[in-house]
Design a protein with these regions (language model features):
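C-terminal beta-strand-rich structural cap/linker in extracellular carbohydrate-active enzymes
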Residues: 40-53
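Generic recognition of long tandem-repeat/solenoid scaffolds
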Residues: 3-5, 35-40, 90, 150, ...
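Surface-exposed interfaces of beta-sheet-rich extracellular modules
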Residues: 1-37
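Feature responds to low-complexity, polar/acidic, surface-exposed segments characteristic
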Residues: 26-30, 52-70, 83-131, 139-159, ...
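Extracellular/luminal Pro/Thr/Ser-rich low-complexity repeat and linker "mucin-like" segments
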Residues: 1-4, 67-80, 89
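Extracellular/surface recognition and adhesion modules
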Residues: 3-5, 16, 36-38, 49, ...
Length: 235
């Protein structure tokens, strides 16, 4: 006799027993894919299955399942947006560089190949971020720090990261609410980033830290992946 014990999504089989009319447990053979077989006795049998919730496991050893950014990191890893920094680590508290941010965005966009003459002396052809920078420059998502440099290893501020996201979304500043003024450090938001920050607040991509936006603080890898998750998880 074959029985199938298939749990609902998010659950796993914890225990499965088959007993005869006398309460004797019958031997089950696991055939894989949730199927089990047993020898049917000359009597009725009772089948009992217990299911429990699956234990959530993190894709990276330094990302706790209870961290505010866990779902974002998990989403980004599943989407191929990030593979971490190696050795099973994500580096959530490390500052995110300009190269990393445009690479995350490029991958979120589907890693498009563009025909664009890139003249950035500090972006080596063949580097992991070269095609991402080429795309970002061609789409106006990012600009160089000078006419022929991109500064790929420079740390990105929260304001700069939000500006990249805003440009990629191609939002119109004229449609935005003025929300930045509700934060105590509103005056420290760079002028170029004001439309982007208002957009990010309106879309709940950025929520601030209490009464502060901290626009000039370094944007961590956990933060940029969280911004991306909030902006593009349903796209």
């Amino acid at each position: 006799m074959t029985i199938t014990a298939k749990p609902d999504s998010g659950y796993q089989l914890d225990d499965l027993t088959v007993t005869d009319k006398n309460g004797k447990e019958l031997k089950l053979t696991d055939k894989g894919n949730g199927k089990y077989t047993f020898t049917m006795p000359a009597s009725k049998v009772e089948i009992n299955a217990t299911f429990v919730k699956e234990v959530e496991t993190s894709p990276f050893s330094d990302v706790s399942t209870s961290a505010y950014y866990y779902e974002a990191v998990k989403w980004a890893q599943e989407k191929g947006i990030t593979g971490g920094i190696g050795n099973g680590l994500f580096g959530p508290n490390q500052p995110c560089t300009r190269a990393q941010i445009v690479t995350f965005l490029w991958r979120a966009a589907g890693s498009p190949v563009v025909n664009y003459a890139m003249n950035m002396s500090d972006v080596p052809e063949g580097s992991y971020y070269a095609e991402a920078v080429r795309w970002a420059l061609s789409e106006g998502v990012a600009t160089g720090t000078t006419g022929n440099t991109f500064s790929p290893d420079s740390e990105c501020t929260r304001a700069q990261a939000v500006a990249f996201l805003f440009r990629y979304a191609a939002s119109e500043a004229v449609t935005l609410q003025e929300l930045v003024s509700g934060f105590s450090d509103a005056d420290s938001v760079p002028g170029y980033a004001l439309p982007a920050m208002n957009w990010a607040l309106a879309e709940e991509i950025v929520q601030g830290n209490g009464s502060k936006l901290m626009p000039n603080d370094s944007c961590t890898r956990a933060q940029i992946v969280t911004f991306l998750f909030r902006a593009y998880q349903d796209k």
